[in-house]
Amino acid sequence: MGLSVGIYGGSGYVGVELVRLLAGHPEVGSLAVASRGHAGRRIGEVYPQVAVGGEYLDPSEVDVSSLDVAFVAYGHGESAEAVRGLLEGGVRLVVDLSADFRLPDVRVYEEWYGEHPAPELLGEAHYGLPEVFGALEGRLVANPGCYPTAAILALAPVVRRMGGEVRSVTINALSGVSGAGAKPSARTHFVSVNESVSPYGVSGGEPRHRHTPEIEIMLRRLGEAPPVTFVPHLLPISRGELETITVEAGELPGAEEVLGWYREDYGGWRFVEAREEVPHISHVANTNRARLSAAVDRRAGKLLLFAAVDNLLKGAAGEAVQNMNLALGYPEDLGLEHLR
């Protein structure tokens, strides 16, 4: 029979990647794809590049009681309401791709996002970066944000080993326009992004991107870590993400030592690789890989970490399927082998 899987928010950029991946997954028997904006339209009509049959359903048309697994790709706030209904409806596993369950402290969530619709579920959520925090043992996965995925993979081995020696962390991140979502806006219009690069998430003279507390909280689970300065930039490309992370610390390790830490921590995982060559976005676009590297500027006394991911795959849909695989006891790369 195979798994009965539902996708809520299946017409956004992340949602359609989920459709593409799960339609070809060997353990998925049936797929219900919900979209309020496109209910009744054929999936291939909305996204001709996706060779998947069937129509988008209105969320109310999905038989929740029949689902084994549900993926929720709504925005924050709306997502939590859907997750609550799915868990109450008996769905075996829910993978939420919004920010609603990434921050375990409701006070921190409300500072950055507003009132939380389902705070009683925060304690049930497992932060789904398996290479760092392992696989889920429960029913709810909080899929990480794209920027935190790259940042935490790069920083986790350093924080584990250097802890209180780290004095400051500055993350300079660049992402393709798909990271801003499918809904058009003046900021993501072709004329606005073409032949330009612009920082965002800076408000009132202060960097205030919502991924900042997510990165800080997860690093502090691993060891002593300072506040993080995080500034993302929009690139005039469709997909992909590159981060250059500057770490100030007391005694700096060598670049080869850091690469050794990466290989030690991630050697048993399929989708994280460390190389001496600095990563390019083109190295990881359209894959579920994260590529890491390191360098040391001894003249300035700084450690430089580099991380590249595809924001729609390892930064979202690919990681979500990886989390499903691990939670259900399948190999982590099942259905993702072509994305290694």
Curated annotation (Swiss-Prot):
SUPFAM superfamilies tied to this protein: Glyceraldehyde-3-phosphate dehydrogenase-like, C-terminal domain (SSF55347), NAD(P)-binding Rossmann-fold domains (SSF51735)
GO cellular component, one term: cytoplasm
Major subcellular location class: cytoplasm
Top-rank taxon: Bacteria
PROSITE patterns in the cross-refs: ARGC
Coiled-coil features, chain-numbered ranges: none
EC number, UniProt record: 1.2.1.38
Reaction(s) this enzyme catalyzes, per UniProt: N-acetyl-L-glutamate 5-semialdehyde + phosphate + NADP(+) = N-acetyl-L-glutamyl 5-phosphate + NADPH + H(+)
Pathway: Amino-acid biosynthesis; L-arginine biosynthesis; N(2)-acetyl-L-ornithine from L-glutamate: step 3/4
A Pfam family this chain is assigned to: Semialdhyde_dh
Record's keyword terms, sorted: Amino-acid biosynthesis, Arginine biosynthesis, Cytoplasm, NADP, Oxidoreductase
Active site: 146
Keyword field contains Heme: no
Positions of transmembrane segments: none
InterPro entries per record: AGPR_AS, AGPR_type-1, NAD(P)-bd_dom_sf, NAGSA_dehydrogenase, Semialdehyde_DH_NAD-bd
Protein family membership: Belongs to the NAGSA dehydrogenase family. Type 1 subfamily.
PANTHER family attached to this UniProt entry: N-ACETYL-GAMMA-GLUTAMYL-PHOSPHATE REDUCTASE, CHLOROPLASTIC-RELATED, N-ACETYL-GAMMA-GLUTAMYL-PHOSPHATE REDUCTASE, CHLOROPLASTIC-RELATED-RELATED
Its job: Catalyzes the NADPH-dependent reduction of N-acetyl-5-glutamyl phosphate to yield N-acetyl-L-glutamate 5-semialdehyde.
Protein name: N-acetyl-gamma-glutamyl-phosphate reductase
Gene giving rise to this polypeptide: argC
